Amino acid sequence: MANIVKTAFANMGWMMISQIIASVCAFVWTIVTAWYLGPSDYGIFGAAVSFAALFGIIIDFGLPTYLVRSISTDFDNEHIYLDNSISLKLFLAVFYVIAVYLTSMALGWENKLVMMCLLIAIENVIKSYHALLFSSFQAHEKMKYQAITNTVLNVLTLLFIILITFTDLSLVGIAFAYIFANFIALIYEIFALRKHIIKPKLSFDFDFYRVLLKAGLPFALNGLFYTIYYSIDLVMITHFSTTYATGLYNSAYKLITVLTLFYTIYSSVVFPVMSKLFKNEKDLLKLSFVKSIKYLSLVTIPISVFTMFYGFDIIQIYGAEYIEAGGVLTVLIWTVCFLFVNGASSLILNASHNEYSVTKIYSIAAIFNICLNFVLIPNYSVYGAAVSTVLSEILILFLQFYMVSKINQLPDRHLVFDLLKICFASGLLGIVLYFLNLNMWVAMPVSIVVYFAVILLVKTIDQEDKLIIKQIMGR
């Protein structure tokens, strides 16, 4: 237990450093891009990103998640898994780019939007290889090199975007900034993988392709439905409203994305650990699930409360043009709470070979989300899309907890009490913010002090948590 915890949190330490750098870079380039493009062009950019993501199942096909689970329990056959996945993606990439381009043309979109869809698709091909090679780092629990790759990628992206704004290369230039940054970071990633873990090569085993595609399909469908209800809103806003409205929604959504990057780190560290625990120690698997929900909620709920009060202040970092997006942010922020808890549930279901259950849940949520968008977006525009996303997350919460209960991993009443304590502390924080009515920058440190004082007062951190902290610190 001690070694598992220390390894997991050592990896998380590397990823956390990388994430801090990534979050700062993403925060800055999001503001710079939105400020440089303005709401309308920023809406085109957001629509292109979301539209290209809808076809992500073609290029991803669930291979990274499947490889993490397979390699982490079968290192001897890593070459077979990785080499064939690399070559398989070459074929998938061609189909993916063609599908994005032809579909965007068929929809009759303006040339600028079609061109952006094509460029973003090319970027996504490179990103898909990042995800594929990351699976090897994650399976070996050597997150240091993934962290360095992410740092290189995010720093280069920021530098290139700043360069584009100074040279005034417009919307297309922004797309090329992402492409070049991803390509250079991929070169480093390949070098690190070859030096420290394995030397991948191309292997064209068409029989094994069928094995990979069949095994990856449930993960791919899961990702597809997940992408649909997180990306379809921008596409539908563009269709039912204007690119200006899309730009407003995208500005709020991008801030949410910066926060959710923390979950990406957490899942990349915890999933391979959960896969091993399912095979060897199922009691510790449940413990990791319970603690995941507790620690993620400990962070996300107070952030959501704070944003609910200061959403209009936060959104002004983009400039006065985006002030209307403040209301959208105060609604969308609640998706973070549910997304993190739902993410932990997805991890335990995937790790315990119940990926088809996750696929069914996300398919139901995607259909639910699309139906809500058809009703709400034409009438309430960006606010309708935000409400639709939150309600979809709530639906997923109930469905996933039902499935978790069927594999006897449902948390006991102790977690319920912990969550009630976190909600109490967050609610008290909300009351303090309401009555004090402080400036946002003053409210930040005040909120931290008030929240953690209440957390300690109600004894949310128990002896088990303290033991985990000691193990992380090597005591």
Where does each model-flagged region fall?
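Helix-terminus/linker motif at the lipid-water interface of multi-pass membrane proteins
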Residues: 27-41, 165, 224-259, 272, ...
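Hydrophobic alpha-helical transmembrane segments
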Residues: 114, 118, 148-195, 211, ...
